[in-house]
Amino acid sequence: MKGLKRLSGPRRSNRGCFLGLLLVGLFLWTAVPCGAERVTVKRVNDGDTVQLADGRLVRYIGIDAPEIDHARHTAQPMGFEARRRNAALVEGRTLRLELDIERLDDYGRTLAYVFLPDGAMVNERLLQAGLAFCLSTMPNVQYEGRLLAAQRMAMRAKAGLWRNWSEPGGRYIGNRNSRRFHLASCPETKRIAPRNRVMFSTRWDAFWSGYAPSRDCQPGL
């Protein structure tokens, strides 16, 4: 048709590329994978638990942050720091929850991997900052390797929990099935089948291997 100018090739191409990238970005944020949902965080309880606007409690999969005693206003080392970092990441924001095989814990909390709008995983961010350690629990192990890599990054950098590390001495025994480690003197170790026993000379070695401290006999951090 006369009187109309065609856009030049490069200009049309640049505009098309920009629109294409914009659409891809919008798709990545709005598309919700199977087993995932968009939620808004109302309150942060501690370093690994939040309350959603709909009232549900969410416990982050694959990590364990230092405990906070809300009644006494006390906490394990780095407990308040973990809560502050968690709050800075998620409080009041709309995020994406990704579920695994087991969706609720024994307390009725939703078990989830939590993703920020930019795609970063909050579980992973807290490990990278040294404000939590890996807590591998079957069958929810989809990102086990990725989370362990994040913990090792923090350990190498001596970040957070790993900053002023000291070893009290002694030996430790891990359970291949539960991925927990115990003081060698703990009676619980007698229940571990020989084929499932893993010996560690230090707590550092146990954490580096992806084992978490058992609540029995408290090998701790």
List each language-model region with its residue ranges.
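Small beta-barrel nucleic-acid-binding modules, primarily SNase/OB-fold domains
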Residues: K2-L221
